Amino acid sequence: MNQHFHRGILFYHQAAGQGNLYKSLGQVTESLTQMCDDLTLKLSEEGGDIAKFCDDLTQNQNGVSYDVFFVLGGDGTVNELVNGVARNNLEIPIGIIPGGTFNDFTKTLNLSPRTAAAANELLNSKIKSFDVLKVNDTYALNFAGIGMMVQNSENVDANKKRILGKFSYVFTTLKVIANPKIYQYTIKANNEEYSGETSMILIANGNYVGGSKIPLEDLSPSDGEMNIFVFKNHNMSLIKDFFQVKDSLRWNDITENIRLITTDEMKLETRPSTKIDIDGEIMFDTPVDIKLLKDKVKLLYIDVNE
């Protein structure tokens, strides 16, 4: 049965649409107008516009109400909407339409990476509650991390990203692996303390990061737990270890280079202090407190079992 809503709003960014914004908007609205009696398009001109819209909506400053949100853009645009919804405790479901380089969480939602196809698939979507990471006072749908992933993001040239897309990250990743920064870390979780040296720590809620699937069979963004991957060294065997599929019960028994910690709350400290990547946005430095908020947002997804 097709999804149908009374009033919806589509947020989009000027850089969305995978190279052709207005063509993408036309394709997307063709599907979304079939889902909504009333559809509004809202351009995000500056960072923070979408979150502020959610703040104003909570205070009823907009004078209208909506029963579905859509967002066309990359992970950063999606992250802003998730923050606006989560911090205002809105119960409005979100439909994510890929319009950036990776759009990792759309893979978790079983949506096509192609803009028009994903919008069309939403016609037959279902609504499901998903967990969210709270990193200090910021929310993350997919991941948070330090180390090589931050180096990678900071070193990607904006022009190369525009021209090469995903390949720009590949080139930068190879350089970072060859010369990573090493940190002393302390993690407090599960009434225990973990410490040592690391080149990267990934705190995952979603199944995909940087366009690649995390090889943990029982990882789920709806299980009430976050999965912390601590990369102990930085040689090429680390990469081989990470991409061998395992389950959480056997991970630490068969993987020497990457420690797995599963929890719903943690504190991370590093020496020296370092920047943290939150769903592709680098916002502040360690130390950080991270909590897993169960069923915090509602998203449209495709049930592949039907």
UniProtKB/Swiss-Prot annotation:
- Which segments constitute the DAGKc domain? 3-139
Query: Binding positions for Mg(2+)?
Result: S220, D223, E225
According to its UniProt entry, the protein's GO biological process terms are: phospholipid biosynthetic process
SUPFAM superfamilies reported in the protein's UniProt record: NAD kinase/diacylglycerol kinase-like
Matching InterPro entries, A to Z?
Answer: ATP-NAD_kinase_N, Diacylglycerol/lipid_kinase, Diacylglycerol_kinase_cat_dom, Lipid_Phosphate_FormReg, NAD/diacylglycerol_kinase_sf, YegS/DAGK_C
What is the E.C. number? Answer: 2.7.1.-
Cofactor(s) the protein requires to work: Mg(2+)
Q: Which UniProt keywords apply?
A: ATP-binding, Kinase, Lipid biosynthesis, Lipid metabolism, Magnesium, Metal-binding, Nucleotide-binding, Phospholipid biosynthesis, Phospholipid metabolism, Transferase
Q: Where is the active site?
A: E281 (proton acceptor)
Identify the residues that bind ATP: S44, G74, D75, G76, T77, V78, N79, E80, T101
**General function of this protein:** May catalyze the ATP-dependent phosphorylation of lipids other than diacylglycerol (DAG).
What is the protein named? Putative lipid kinase Sca_1050
Q: Which organism is it from?
A: Staphylococcus carnosus (strain TM300)
